[in-house]
Amino acid sequence: IGSKLFILANGDLYAYDKEDTSIRTYSKSFPLSDTEISYIAYQSAYKSLVIIYSNANIDLLVNEEDIYNLPDYKNKNMTQDKTINHACFYKEYTYLSTASGILCINLKKREISNYYPLNKNVLACNVSDNHLYAATSEGLFAGLLTENLLDIKNWKKVSDDTSEFLSQYHDIPFKGEVPENITPNSPVRNYPYYMNFAGERLLITGGGHIANRLDRPGTIMTFENNTWNSFQEEGISEQTKHRYDDINCIVQDPKDIAHHFAASAGEGIYEFKDGKFINWYSMHNSPLESAVPNEPWADSYVRVNGLIYDKENNLWMVSCETQHAVSVLMKNGDWVSLHYPEIVKASNFGRTIFDKRGWLWATSSRIESGGLFCLNYNGTIADTSDDQHRFITRFTNQDGALLEQLAVYCIAEDKEGVIWIGTNRGPLVLNNPSRYFNDNFYCTQIKVPRNDDSGLADFLLVNEAINAIAIDGANRKWIGTASNGIYLISADGMETIHHFTEENSPLLSNSIVSIAIHPRTGEVFIGTGKGLVSYQSDATEAENSFKESNVRAYPNPVRPDYS
């Protein structure tokens, strides 16, 4: 299109300018209306790029800037498959081949004008000699444009063989000698399973596992100073002789910003320097253990997660269903393996934090055996005789109600030292975490008054599965749910300030998997099941003074009608 080449890759749209070699990315944040693009086609006379989404939504991108959404086909009440396979152009019309017919769009009016139901999977279509031809899985059909093509009787089968037709309208000749890679400044994959800030550098891994592996390519990305970078992937499997995928988390060395460790869902941990792989720790060269030590595939079940440094620069980690579920790589290179009987059978250990007291907390997300583990090692890592530790699988709330079958997905400590955990039963609050080892310890389910003169209240986000919680500079809670978008909750949990969903905002998906907040700017990075989006919040970390560089007036990229 002019000097620009529009590229569809992995469901995302880019424009590459051949003159200045710049790359522009298009997204739901601006200007697109949806995510997961499956097909694009361009009509030059009306300067319209037709954008088809996997959910059958349709956009028209006109003059490279203006977007017109045509959602009627996506919203149409029909039992047939709505998949769109192909587009062709004739005069002011675009004909879209679908899994059950042909959809006609008027580009001049920018509206859907007709739908011709053929009750067949139309692979491609074209107009010739005043006939609309449809190549289907049952042969080639044709309809005269001057007739009523809404009536299926006006479509005639003209051939059983569609191969020549499909070859003519699907094959694209290739010209050129040397291919050129075009790499946009963007994430290498839409897998923001884990996110965390190390200073002002955003660290992201692709994940992950639940009960089983997700089989995602080993993905580690960083975002800093508006630049995306990726860690080495190629060659790691060849060096370790094992698969390299499902990276659960990453941690940056507090003493060396170029030094990182990453944990996997089955192969132990990987060490990187300047983004390059330098070492691998497995059951064969470290005390890390397998969940199935006696099986032939034992070295693919070294399930490590929760990498975190303590204040002394020792690297802690947790592993699933092992005799020594807590391991520490000391700053001098020695290993310490810790045995706590109550977590030997704990599954899906995930997120970890060190609280203000220096206690270690670790979440376990398997409903049948999940819970929250806390360890006070009293400053003596190798000596467990003075340790306090407890694994709670059934919490009691402030009313004495027992919360069973609890899966704990995430954890965060707020500015007041209160600990918030996200569970399959909603958020739970530990107002007095120092009493966690007491037999009478209880959690709090926040009660939000209905304010309808009934005197009744509801538990905050009760029975919502909470995948992520992050605390912003104003001590507010950003809470990401598994299927209902993201909430911004007041510091005390009593007020919902915002509730963003894919329906009322540029949020890519209602399935939130991770949240991280930039410590200086307050920008909220939200990992979803369809990729990453950010929101410029109005709360930043406290600074010593107000100055132009750290204060922004009402920063809000979300349009006013979304609030």
Q: What is the meaning of each model-derived region?
A:
Residues S27-S33, P71-T79, W155-S186, N229-R243, ...:
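Surface-exposed loop and turn segments in beta-propeller and other repeat-based domains
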Residues E36-Y39, T83-N85, P184-Y194, R243-I250, ...:
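Signature of short aromatic-glycine-proline-rich micro-motifs recurring in repeat-based ectodomains
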Residues Y14, A56-I58, G101-L103, G139-F141, ...:
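Short glycine/acidic-enriched loop and turn motifs that connect beta-strands
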Residues G2, Y42-Y46, F89-K91, V127-D129, ...:
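Residue-level detector of Asp-centered blade-edge/turn motifs that repeat once per structural unit
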Residues K4-I7, S48-I51, Y93-L96, H131-A134, ...:
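Conserved beta-propeller blade signature
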Residues G426, S511-F546:
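Blade-level signature of beta-propeller repeat domains, shared across WD40, Kelch, NHL, RCC1
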Residues P254, N544-S563:
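Surface-exposed, proline-anchored Ser/Thr-rich loop/turn motifs
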Residues E64-I67, L145-L150, N226-W228, D274-N279, ...:
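Short loop/turn segments immediately following beta-strands, especially the blade-tip
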